[in-house]
């Protein structure tokens, strides 16, 4: 699943070519994503100039003077440029075509769990956006905040930091990596972790996410950035996808467990 670094990489890849362009048409070949793409989307957006892009958690906002296109990449989505008139493949569901017509913005989603929604309201007040927690790379995400939110919570720390109401964008890959870097077992209860260790975890989440963004995200299967290229952070992964392999610190075999139907990999020697 594309997580925050992949979404940020996508935004940075498409923004320079999008801003200032006017939409000529929207070709919707498959409207059945996580939520149905409404037939009105094309008429609402045609002729509109894109003013800027922004991100909230894993949602990309493509803004015009009239409203905002909200895009979520779901489990397997990608948003990238192709030369105009490039024939679509089976999983290429939507094309955004521009007046100058040299390139199109294409949305591809094999599993169709993503979303493309239009709103004329402030997108921060949209039902999908307004309840989200702070951005992990912002000053609002800090040790004081996390300690207060964790107090008394009897849920595993990995599950806790993956809750988008606590902090946005920390998905399975980067939760595994940040907890390893912080030396915290993923099954330790959030409410039992000291403020000092939570401060270390906050620092590690920020470091891991920033490094992943710098590498263009992590490509495990489907993801490509806005330039159509894969992310290269996979080569930096210390625990995710490395069950039973040697720990990069102590060389002991890494252990895999299941948490909330997701794979969790950690070192029983280096994480406590």
Curated annotation (Swiss-Prot):
Sites where the protein binds DNA: 91, 111, 153
Domain of life: Bacteria
Alphabetical list of InterPro entries matching this protein: DNA_glyclase/AP_lyase_DNA-bd, DNA_glyclase_Znf_dom_DNA_BS, Formamido-pyr_DNA_Glyclase, FPG_cat, MutM-like_N-ter, Ribosomal_uS13-like_H2TH, Znf_DNA_glyclase/AP_lyase, Znf_FPG/IleRS
Needed cofactors: Zn(2+)
EC number, UniProt record: 3.2.2.23, 4.2.99.18
Reactions the enzyme catalyzes: Hydrolysis of DNA containing ring-opened 7-methylguanine residues, releasing 2,6-diamino-4-hydroxy-5-(N-methyl)formamidopyrimidine; 2'-deoxyribonucleotide-(2'-deoxyribose 5'-phosphate)-2'-deoxyribonucleotide-DNA = a 3'-end 2'-deoxyribonucleotide-(2,3-dehydro-2,3-deoxyribose 5'-phosphate)-DNA + a 5'-end 5'-phospho-2'-deoxyribonucleoside-DNA + H(+)
GO biological process: base-excision repair
Keyword DNA damage attributed: yes
Disulfide bonds: none
ZnF start-end (FPG-type): 238-272
A Pfam entry, by short name: zf-FPG_IleRS
Cofactor note: Binds 1 zinc ion per subunit.
This protein's UniProt keywords: DNA damage, DNA repair, DNA-binding, Glycosidase, Hydrolase, Lyase, Metal-binding, Multifunctional enzyme, Zinc, Zinc-finger
Molecular function terms, GO-annotated: 8-oxo-7,8-dihydroguanine DNA N-glycosylase activity; class I DNA-(apurinic or apyrimidinic site) endonuclease activity; damaged DNA binding; zinc ion binding
SUPFAM superfamilies from the UniProt entry: Glucocorticoid receptor-like (DNA-binding domain) (SSF57716), N-terminal domain of MutM-like DNA repair proteins (SSF81624), S13-like H2TH domain (SSF46946)
Catalytic residue positions: 2-3, 58, 262
Function according to Swiss-Prot or TrEMBL: Involved in base excision repair of DNA damaged by oxidation or by mutagenic agents. Acts as a DNA glycosylase that recognizes and removes damaged bases. Has a preference for oxidized purines, such as 7,8-dihydro-8-oxoguanine (8-oxoG). Has AP (apurinic/apyrimidinic) lyase activity and introduces nicks in the DNA strand. Cleaves the DNA backbone by beta-delta elimination to generate a single-strand break at the site of the removed base with both 3'- and 5'-phosphates.
Family classification: Belongs to the FPG family.
Subunit structure: Monomer.
Name of the protein in question: Formamidopyrimidine-DNA glycosylase
Organism: Marinomonas sp. (strain MWYL1)
Gene symbol of the encoding locus: mutM
């Amino acid at each position: 699943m594309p997580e925050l670094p992949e979404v940020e990489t996508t935004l940075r890849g498409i923004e320079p070519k999008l801003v200032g362009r006017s939409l000529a048409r929207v070709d919707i070949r498959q409207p059945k994503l996580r939520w149905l793409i409404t037939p009105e989307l094309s008429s609402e957006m045609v002729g509109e100039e894109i003013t800027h892009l922004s991100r909230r958690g894993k949602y990309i906002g493509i803004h015009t003077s009239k409203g905002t296109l909200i895009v979520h990449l779901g489990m397997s989505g990608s948003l990238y440029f192709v030369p105009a008139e490039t024939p679509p493949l089976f999983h290429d569901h939507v094309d955004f075509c521009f007046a100058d017509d040299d390139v199109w913005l294409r949305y591809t989603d094999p599993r169709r769990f993503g979303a493309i929604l239009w709103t004329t309201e402030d997108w921060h007040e949209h039902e999908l956006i307004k309840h989200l927690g702070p951005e992990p790379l912002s000053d609002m995400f800090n040790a004081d905040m996390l300690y207060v939110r964790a107090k008394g919570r009897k849920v595993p720390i990995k599950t806790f930091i993956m809750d988008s109401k606590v902090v946005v964008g920390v998905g399975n890959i980067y939760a595994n990596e940040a907890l390893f870097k912080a030396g915290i077992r993923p099954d330790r209860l959030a409410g039992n972790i000291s403020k000092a260790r939570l401060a270390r975890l906050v620092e590690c989440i920020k470091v891991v996410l920033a490094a992943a963004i710098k590498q263009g995200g992590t490509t495990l299967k489907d993801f490509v950035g806005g330039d159509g290229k894969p992310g290269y952070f996979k080569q930096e992964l210390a625990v995710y996808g490395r069950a039973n392999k040697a720990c990069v610190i102590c060389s002991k075999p890494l252990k895999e467990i299941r948490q909330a139907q997701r794979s969790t990999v950690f070192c029983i020697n280096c994480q406590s």
